[in-house]
Amino acid sequence: IPLAVAFPKDVADIQQLIAFATKNEITLIPRTAGTSLAGQCVGDGIVVYVSKHFTNILSFDEEAKTITVEPGIIRDELNNYLKPHELFFGPNTSTSNRCMIGGMVGNNSSGSTSIRYGVTRDKVLSIDTVLSDGSLVTFAEISSDAFKQKMELETHEGSIYKAIYSELIFDSAQEEIKKEFPKETIHRRNTGYAVDEFLKSDLFGGTKPTINVAKLLAGSEGTLAFSIAITLQLDEVQPKESILITSHFNSINESLKATLITMRHNLYTCELMDKAILDCTKNNREQAKNRFFLQDNPEAVLLLEVAANSIEEVEILANNLIADLEKNNFGYHHKKIYGNDIQKVFALRKAGLGLLGNMIGDKKAVACIEDTAVALEDLPNYIEEFTAMMDAYQQKAIYYAHAGAGEIHLRPILNLKKKEDVVLFRKITTETAKLVK
């Protein structure tokens, strides 16, 4: 339970909160919308809401395709502002109509578009922060020489640069990071601090003549500095013509093997829904009408989106994708979805997460394995081994989300009112962590 909740009106208020917390040895928990699922925005210190007063767009450079915002701006509202300029902020979570940029940076959020537009860390250019001593510091891309100059500063900022250098300059540290951190091909990763980003710099054995500490703040969940302004790189909006192929499969494993084929096709979306999620929508008045694309009773459906600047081009892309799946004997039905119907399918996919909470009875799909990611080529084997583990415990799970990125959200169906299922909760999560590793 938090000790207190604060709603700072300006940067001076944040500095006062930091001074008070430091003096009294209390933690601060920066918080925006609180839509994350793993407890990142709760704690026993002072919860600091920036969602009320830090909601402004500070600057916008249309030519450079960059924008600077305060952390409390909502992701979809930002994109509504950018729409007339045919630009947008790419990372797209299922909570995009309420999640905020500060939280997305803290979590290194990604969402359904990451296979095309990357994750939040990729879009962060600089972050204006308040440090633990109350000083105001901007972290941005700087040259290796500028990094060394920062190390000479007799300030808290200088001590940060010195600490980074002293930790990473040794070959042994660099080798340990390379050994223990995820493969570079695993793009979706928000576990721990992204110190492996620094190994790209020529300071630490890489080839880049620059380094950016803001990349470390992305995914740090507000533990390193208090963000007050964030500069983002924007993307041009998706080509105007798109087709969504809804590929139906008789098993989860078949759909994941098919993903290896689909990802050769320059997709904009590659998302998985399993039978359990689809079944949750049957009796929902709002979503039942969005089930129009389903044929028979698939165990899994992949949502595969292609896009181009003309309908002729996009039809060729869609037909090539379907032909490739059929040639490799994957799936039993591949329906092409057009126009406004595409958003209806995505609405069903987004609603699925919330509808899981309406499962009848005490058994619920428990959010405890949210962002395990593996290399795409390892995904079928990983899920096969996870399913075998669940079978050994005589348990079922929900499988959904970001197949094309090698990240499936897995939700064991447990009754946490029963002691034995609470024990299983711990066993399943621990064994899954080892399995991913």
Q: What label would you give each PLM region?
A:
Residues 1, 37-38, 42, 82-126, ...:
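A gly/ser-rich beta-alpha-beta helix-loop segment of oxidoreductase catalytic cores
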Residues 1-28, 46, 50-95, 105, ...:
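N-terminal glycine-rich flavin-associated loop
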Residues 14-27, 82-99, 103, 192-217, ...:
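Short, hydrophobic/aliphatic alpha-helical segments
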Residues 28-31, 270:
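ATP-grasp fold ATP-binding core
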Residues 41, 62, 403-405:
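A generic beta-sheet turn/junction motif
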Residues 143-210:
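Phosphate/pyrophosphate- and phosphate-bearing ligand-binding catalytic cores of soluble enzymes
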Residues 199, 207-210, 214-427, 433-437:
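C-terminal substrate-recognition/cap domain of FAD-linked oxidoreductases
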